[in-house]
Amino acid sequence: MNHAMRPIHPQAVPDDPLAVRWVVHTGTQGVVGEVVVAPDPFGALMRDRVISLALLETEGIWVWLAPGNNWADRGHKVRQAILESLDRDGWHINGDSADLLRLVANDVISGDLADEVHAADTTVEVVENDAQWLLLDLGQLDSRDPAASAELQQRIETAIRVRYPLLQDTARLGGPQSSHFTLSNTPRRALWTDD
């Protein structure tokens, strides 16, 4: 696909001014995860420490700027670098990412499926996750209407898999096969420092 024709737009990441999700069809199909190496010009921004972390999904790329950079100054350059680099060879992706799965899941819940969640008169929260599994809390919906809870869980899982195909399973608190694992869900940041 000609990069000039590829639609792309930025989406702010709540509570993280250094992060932007660039909504763009990446063409990666089943390849998602942390970008370790990228072709230029995107790769040059990583090597030059303009970009500190990039996570690739099928419908976007999440980008964190290194401290000392801002989107007002770097946004256009990052956008152009994404467009010029996506169709080039040389991408090396670190297979799966618990951080990316959580980001995609929260974005699906609060964005793509926000109307369905609101219509179900419930809240949805990602309680735990690893790189291939999610535990969801669907609020009081399961006790009020287990069938509606199962349907909402399935819709969430399907929407996430479109963007993160490595998702293998979801469970819900109070639902069938629910369990509670103790996992660290603190997102890590690959931020460079001069220390």
Describe the residue ranges of each PLM region.
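Domain-level signature for proteins that mediate thiol-based redox and metal-cofactor handling
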Residues: 1-195
